[in-house]
Amino acid sequence: MAIKKITIVGAGRVGEATAQFLVKNELCRELVLLDAQEGVAQGAALDIQQSAPLFDFDARVTGSTNYELIADSDLVVITAGKPRKPGMSRSDVLDSNLPIITDIMNNVMRFAPQSLVMIVTNPVDVLTYHAWRHCGWDRARVFGQAGVLDSARMASFIAGETGLSVKDISAMVLGGHGDTMLPLIRYTTISGIPLTHFLDQQVIEKIIERTRHGGFEILRLRQTSSAYDAPAAAIAGMVDAIRHNRKRILPCVAILQGEYGENEVAMGVPSVLGGDGLERIVELPLTEEEQEQFKHSVEAIRTDLAHLARA
């Protein structure tokens, strides 16, 4: 699929930052920012459009509350929803964000039925599954952003501890986007060299815990807002892989249909991202301990899915 038009639903901090990344990196020709609150998307779009001469991009940016403008979108990125507050988990916002995603998907199905859909709204694992079940589309077309961000956070922490270039660090995080995520140390390297060659286990464990709580750390420090620059950069990285059909292996929230021994659940797993969306899931060999941790992450998501079923 040639990505020409992208819609971002939700013109909050993540949505606006994502729009900036996309146009500055020339990842679309037309971008629509949509928000339920009148004036928010329009103002953000106008601000971004006026930076075009300074950043030298030609994309046309439009803000609106009208879903009719999303017609012919190749990709819809959903960032809308109630944000977390200090002390809240990602699951705590499920009740508020479930009807928001349902309404958005109804409009996407009506006005952009040919599009790919990327879910960013938390809890992203549960809401990705809900969006997929609600629309009934092929799983390649509905996926979530989480693992790219979590892996980037882990890589940045590793760079800080080792003093080495983050460009040479390859980190891999599986599982849910939260406390049960599974940073895979065996698959984390620096220029192909295992991480354990550079750091002892105590430091690695500290990095793992900091990665698991990376979003909360920012929320605790800022108080009034959660992370938005790094999530937006992660979204842009995924869009780049799709737009340019790069066939990159990135950790994405994908619908599992037998992979890793699981069905009917959305989880963060290594996936091939290309022009057709999430084209393939890569199954990594896991140790017995890693399998147990992965299963624990699945069970945590299934708990939220059971709550969703009762909603």
Swiss-Prot record:
Q: Where does substrate bind?
A: 84, 90, 122, 153
Any idea which residues are catalytic in this one?
Answer: 177
Alphabetized InterPro entries for the sequence: L-lactate/malate_DH (IPR001557), Lactate/malate_DH_C (IPR022383), Lactate/malate_DH_N (IPR001236), Lactate_DH/Glyco_Ohase_4_C (IPR015955), Malate_DH_type3 (IPR011275), NAD(P)-bd_dom_sf (IPR036291)
CDD domains per the record? LDH-like_MDH
Under Enzyme Commission nomenclature, its number is: 1.1.1.37
> Which reaction(s) are listed as its catalytic activity?
(S)-malate + NAD(+) = oxaloacetate + NADH + H(+)
Stored Pfam families? Ldh_1_C, Ldh_1_N
Q: What class of enzyme is it?
A: oxidoreductase
Protein's UniProt keywords contain Oxidoreductase: yes
Write one Gene Ontology MF term.
L-malate dehydrogenase (NAD+) activity
Q: Which GO terms describe its biological process?
A: lactate metabolic process; tricarboxylic acid cycle
Cite the entry's keywords alphabetically. Answer: NAD, Oxidoreductase, Tricarboxylic acid cycle
Chain sites annotated for binding NAD(+): 10-15, 35, 97, 120-122
> What functional role does this protein have?
Catalyzes the reversible oxidation of malate to oxaloacetate.
**What HAMAP family does this protein map onto?**
Malate_dehydrog_3
Entry's family note: Belongs to the LDH/MDH superfamily. MDH type 3 family.
Q: What is this protein called?
A: Malate dehydrogenase
Species annotation:
Nitrosococcus oceani (strain ATCC 19707 / BCRC 17464 / JCM 30415 / NCIMB 11848 / C-107)
